[in-house]
Amino acid sequence: MNAADEENRSMAVERRSLYEEESTDLPLLRIESRSEDGAESRWIVGYAAKFGVNSLDLGDFVERIDPQAFGIVAERRGRKKPLETRALWNHDPNFPLARYPGTLRMNVDEIGLRYEFPVPDTTYGRDLAANIEAGIVRGSSF
């Protein structure tokens, strides 16, 4: 492999992380165990976006999310028919994790756009939870 091949190869790698890991003191994604009505459940809890933090270099620019960017989340609660939002594994509609309204809960707080949903009882849901717990999957996007 020559230098040109190396350069092309590195340019073909898709970046799936928005933030430098060192720049975040709060985990962007974790598993929580909860007890509701006597039943134990595991929840995936995370931030799809954090306010006031520069993204990784996305080419010739970086993104910085404004705290007003997700005002629509609050607006959805007041509608007769809420706008549907889906949590998907790797943005793939073949791997749904949760849906709003339904099992997906979202809110905007002082940190960013927070979400949570119960770990789905599917092979990919359990695999995702195991990868989060192992630190292999560390974040998400929106």
Positions of predicted regions on the chain:
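Signature of dsDNA virion morphogenesis modules
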Residues: 1-141
